[in-house]
Amino acid sequence: MNEKRYRAVLFDLGGTLRIALEDEPYMRHARRKMTELAGAPLQVEDFYQLVEDRYESYRRGALGENKEAGDRELWCRWLLPDYDQKRIAQVCHELSFEYRQSKGRRVVVDGGAEVIRTLHERGYKLGIVSNLIG
């Protein structure tokens, strides 16, 4: 009997298939870019801390309700409601991207790409299950 027992393999993304390496210059650049995008009058680290504090509050509520906001709602309603809403709406996707980068440089774990290729070549359906922002 040569029938496969499994037809699909699902992977968690953050911390399993992909990890964030602490790369301070990379992370600092992302924090600076966030500050510029928002037009924040604060110092970079002060602005970043403001976003972090508000994100923690948002995240608790989102997890409690099992519902995440899209980029526009996240930045306009939860993270930067006191900033120029037109500007924030225009750059909300970039803000989300830079926020992720501020947590570290994302890389696929050693051997991860090879595992994906091998499973694909063997005919498995592949998927990702994740609770990451963005």
Predicted regions and their residues:
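Glycine-centered loop/turn motif at secondary-structure junctions
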Residues: 39, 83-84, 120-123
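Short histidine/acidic/glycine/proline-rich micro-motifs that form metal-
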Residues: 17, 61, 134
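Active-site neighborhood of HAD-like aspartate-dependent phosphohydrolases
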Residues: 2-50
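Short, solvent-exposed loop/turn segments at secondary-structure boundaries
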Residues: 21-24, 62-63, 103-104
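Soluble or luminal CAZymes and related metallo-dependent hydrolases
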Residues: 26, 67-71, 104-111
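Alpha-helical elements of Rossmann-like donor-binding domains used by nucleotide-donor carbohydrate transfer enzymes
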Residues: 29-33, 53, 74-77, 114
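A metal-dependent, Asp-based hydrolase signature
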Residues: 49-96
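Substrate-recognition element of Asp-dependent hydrolases with the DxDx(T/V) motif
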Residues: 91-108, 112-134
